[in-house]
């Protein structure tokens, strides 16, 4: 599957074509079928399972996910550690990691809250945390196993 392509005309009579393959970023279940969401922002029907990409739950637009993914990429949060993403009608996201931690993000100030959750997750004092709730401004709720 193609994310983008470039065509250059080389004079006098040749073309140089570059094709960039799309990367699969997440799984989505819609109407009982499995789709892959590509870096080209398109849904691709699939029957194959690819390990280590998150499953997205909820009714979201591909732009909603793209915005979240771009914010995660701007931080030190490791996208490959995300097992599930939950999108809510209010427009906010929850992140579940492979280590079993659920991060409840607010609708606003996503980038700084993603950075804060990464700091908490990498601090050994909080290694048994299974819930980080950042929905309330100036307040963090954490729960240990």
Report residues per predicted region.
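Charged, solvent-exposed interaction patches on well-folded alpha/beta domains
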Residues: 3-145
């Amino acid at each position: 599957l193609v994310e983008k392509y470039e065509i250059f005309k080389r004079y006098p009579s040749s073309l140089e074509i570059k094709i960039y393959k799309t990367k699969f970023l997440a799984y989505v279940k819609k109407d009982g079928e499995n789709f892959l969401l590509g870096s080209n922002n398109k849904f691709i029907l699939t029957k194959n399972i690819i390990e280590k990409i998150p499953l997205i739950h909820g009714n979201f637009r591909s732009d909603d996910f793209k915005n979240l993914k771009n914010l995660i990429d701007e931080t030190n949060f490791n996208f490959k550690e995300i097992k599930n993403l939950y999108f809510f009608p209010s427009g906010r996201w929850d992140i579940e990691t492979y280590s079993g931690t659920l991060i409840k993000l607010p609708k606003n100030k996503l980038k700084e809250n993603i950075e804060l959750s990464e700091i908490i997750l990498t601090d050994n004092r909080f290694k048994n945390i299974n819930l980080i709730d950042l929905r309330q401004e100036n307040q963090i709720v954490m729960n240990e196993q």
